[in-house]
């Protein structure tokens, strides 16, 4: 019996501690209309529907050198009280098919001046790729974005001191 690749998924969870207060980190992270503020793989972003709130759809152009040119993404949830956002990739010319992520931000346990950001995702494993290859690719992108968010947040936090 042949296993269908259609339902073969993988996922991961990445954690980033940021030396900046939750309110600052969330103010950057929650901007669905401006991911290029910290996601350095994003060249441009335009909302094709909505105002940046739940249900909004954005068209993202990716910087050259990556194995993609664009991505279409939907904001499924944005909770400013719980500091949670969920995004689905609904189109594009890349290998992250049926990518769904949940990002949460919390005050760090040891000090209110730090924030912990947790991003988890699930994505289809493309035909011809392994779970390990797909997870490694997605982890690299998500990890780089979280590190970039940390750098920007920490730079802004230190400017405010």
UniProtKB/Swiss-Prot annotation:
Assigned keywords, A-Z: Abscisic acid signaling pathway, Cell membrane, Cytoplasm, Membrane, Nucleus, Protein phosphatase inhibitor, Receptor
Region (START-like): 3-154
Binding site for abscisate: 39, 68-73, 95-101, 119
Entry keyword annotation includes Nucleus: yes
UniProt site positions, description: Involved in interactions with PP2Cs: 67, 130
Gene Ontology MF annotations: abscisic acid binding; protein homodimerization activity; protein phosphatase inhibitor activity; signaling receptor activity
Keyword Cytoplasm: yes
Gene Ontology cellular-component annotations: cytoplasm; nucleus; plasma membrane
Site positions for Involved in ABA binding: 87
InterPro entries: Plant_def-hormone_signal (IPR050279), Polyketide_cyclase/dehydratase (IPR019587), START-like_dom_sf (IPR023393)
GO biological process, one term: abscisic acid-activated signaling pathway
Motif (Latch loop): 94-96
Subcellular location field: Cytoplasm; Nucleus; Cell membrane
Alphabetical list of SUPFAM superfamilies matching this protein: Bet v1-like
Domains (record comment): Upon interaction with ABA, the 'latch' and 'gate' loops change in conformation leading to a tight dimerization and the creation a surface that enables the receptor to dock into and inhibit the PP2C active site.
Protein family membership: Belongs to the PYR/PYL/RCAR abscisic acid intracellular receptor family.
Function: Receptor for abscisic acid (ABA) required for ABA-mediated responses such as stomatal closure and germination inhibition. Inhibits the activity of group-A protein phosphatases type 2C (PP2Cs) when activated by ABA. Suppresses the phosphatase activity of TOPP1 in a dose-dependent manner in vitro.
Protein's recorded name: Abscisic acid receptor PYL11
Organism: Arabidopsis thaliana (Mouse-ear cress)
């Amino acid at each position: 019996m042949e296993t269908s690749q259609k339902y073969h998924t993988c996922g991961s969870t990445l954690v980033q501690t940021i030396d900046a207060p939750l309110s600052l980190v969330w103010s950057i992270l929650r901007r669905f209309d401006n991911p290029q503020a910290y996601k350095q793989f994003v060249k441009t972003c335009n909302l094709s529907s909505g105002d940046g709130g739940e249900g909004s759809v954005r068209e993202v152009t990716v910087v050259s050198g990556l194995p993609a040119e664009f991505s279409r993404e939907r904001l499924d949830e944005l909770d400013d009280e719980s500091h949670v956002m969920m995004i689905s990739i609904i189109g594009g010319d890349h290998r992250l098919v049926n990518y769904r992520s949940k990002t949460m931000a919390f005050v760090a346990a040891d000090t209110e001046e730090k924030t912990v950001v947790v991003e988890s995702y699930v994505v289809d494993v493309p035909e011809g790729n392994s779970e390990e290859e797909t997870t490694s690719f997605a982890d690299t992108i998500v990890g780089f974005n979280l590190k970039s968010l940390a750098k920007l947040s920490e730079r802004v936090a230190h400017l405010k001191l």
